Amino acid sequence: MNATLTSLFNIFGILGTLLTLAALLIWIERRLLGFWQERYGPNRVGPFGILQVVADAIKLLTKEDWVPPFADKLVFILAPTVVVIATLLAFAVIPFTPYIGIIDLNIGLLFFLAMSSLSVYSVVLGGWASNNKYSLMGALRAAAQMLSYEVFMGLSLMGVVMLAGTFNLREIVAAQQDMWFCIPQFLGLVVFLIAGIAEAHRLPFDLPEAETELIAGFHTEYSGMKFGLFFVGEYLAILLISALIVTLFFGGWQGPWLPPLVWFFIKFSFFVLFFILLRAALPRPRYDQLMAYGWKLMLPLALLNLVITGAVVLALDGT
């Protein structure tokens, strides 16, 4: 009974924390973008505008729950929920500390890759069900982009698996006791970081929803809370990729003096802020440049990292 209560507390505690962080991240991003662009961010609702997110949520909840008459109603309604559920499920295998985490899977890394793949269905179904040419074009862009960069993401993680000898995320963190994998796996880290940005549809890789080209991409026809779910899903993806980078390459919760959860949060916050800085600093490339960049540069780098890591592991095992 106690084990069940502990598990439920973990699940709902982590779920509530993640949704709160996603909402807080929206406010932090808007404030930082305002600061970097020398303008005011949200500063009217609550102290420093921190309640602006609550005001936006109320606005979305009170909007008419409208479905276009030409849309496939059932698929149109279900699509936004898929991205949020898939992203939250991927968090289930993240070990925040030795004791805080939802489930300890031996195939945790594969589970993450499987859940991140499900997000593609949400985008494609949402674009297709809208029965709008801009939505469909955005959905097809997103499918090609996400499927392509998932290949590079998966290959970049195989070097970590070779060094740790496991797909279990807790054991991968434990394997970094002496040295974080960001040093021997620097190439893998670079590839994973760039692929993660593309998976989350963040600038400079937000081409599926490029406003100047496709109005709003795959969620052009969405409004109200259905649009809000896509919006929350994007920020949850930022949190997920940041948490994975910390876990796989920067020793997870490990660090001197401070409690494990504090160390995890410090590293995690750094990468979340890095995602926001990218939005402020980089332009959006053309779609053909994005795909060429992936297949002509990212794939060779991921394969090179795999070959070098395999050779080093084999040589060390031989000695």
From Swiss-Prot:
| General function of this protein | NDH-1 shuttles electrons from NADH, via FMN and iron-sulfur (Fe-S) centers, to quinones in the respiratory chain. The immediate electron acceptor for the enzyme in this species is believed to be ubiquinone. Couples the redox reaction to proton translocation (for every two electrons transferred, four hydrogen ions are translocated across the cytoplasmic membrane), and thus conserves the redox energy in a proton gradient. This subunit may bind ubiquinone.
The reaction(s) this protein catalyses: a quinone + NADH + 5 H(+)(in) = a quinol + NAD(+) + 4 H(+)(out)
Where, by residue number, does the polypeptide cross the bilayer?
8-28, 74-94, 107-127, 147-167, 179-199, 230-250, 258-278, 297-317
Write down the membrane topology.
Multi-pass membrane protein
Q: Where in the cell is it found?
A: Cell inner membrane
Q: What is its EC number?
A: 7.1.1.-
GO molecular function (one): quinone binding
Keywords tagged on the record = Cell inner membrane, Cell membrane, Membrane, NAD, Quinone, Translocase, Transmembrane, Transmembrane helix, Ubiquinone
Protein name per the record: NADH-quinone oxidoreductase subunit H 1
Q: Which organism is it from?
A: Nitrosococcus oceani (strain ATCC 19707 / BCRC 17464 / JCM 30415 / NCIMB 11848 / C-107)
Q: Which PROSITE patterns does this UniProt record tie to the protein?
A: COMPLEX1_ND1_1 (PS00667), COMPLEX1_ND1_2 (PS00668)
Q: Which GO terms describe its cellular component?
A: plasma membrane
* Record family assignment: Belongs to the complex I subunit 1 family.
**Which Pfam families does this one have?**
NADHdh
Q: Which InterPro entries match?
A: NADH_UbQ_OxRdtase_su1/FPO (IPR001694), NADH_UbQ_OxRdtase_su1_CS (IPR018086)
Q: A GO biological process this protein is involved in? A: aerobic respiration
Keyword Transmembrane helix (UniProt) = yes
Quaternary form?
NDH-1 is composed of 14 different subunits. Subunits NuoA, H, J, K, L, M, N constitute the membrane sector of the complex.
Q: What superkingdom does the record give?
A: Bacteria
